[in-house]
């Protein structure tokens, strides 16, 4: 299934300073890079299995992933899954170093950029986040030769950039990115994550109102 994004369709993001009107197709069919396709089937099967194991049995996965990293240093998925595994066991600095190395070795692979950008976002290094994407916040600007993207690429990119805009006090742009996620994948974890930032829960809203009310009363009493 392919979903085409056209000018003026309501799925386009248009902000003259930051992004262009997007024009590319979105598919849910796998898009595999040539290096990955050339791998032996048993290696591809191992990488897919290790993606799951990095999250549920990270220590076991690390041993296999490090062996694959040494043998196939040009395969970006290995770096991403290895970074996930180290994050799961609490070795955040090691995970970040691997994510950075993965991006440096595979600079054109979107998910290595996204993976390292997550660490920078967590550290509130927002200037670095923008630098990672070359200050291009639209996939058609970042990859001008590509006309087709997998839905997971679009969702994760839109979600992370939406979070970046939210954290840098540009909620209007964050809302635009969230609107795209709502149309494309409203139940995706990244869409829900951005929604939580843009629409804090009832308790948070009540707490803010109580804080403002308390501050107002203190001012009136002066």
Language-model segments: which ranges?
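Flexible helix-coil transition and linker loops at the boundaries of alpha-helical arrays
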Residues: 31-37, 66-70, 139-151
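Alpha-helical segment of the N-proximal tetratricopeptide repeat
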Residues: 39-77, 81
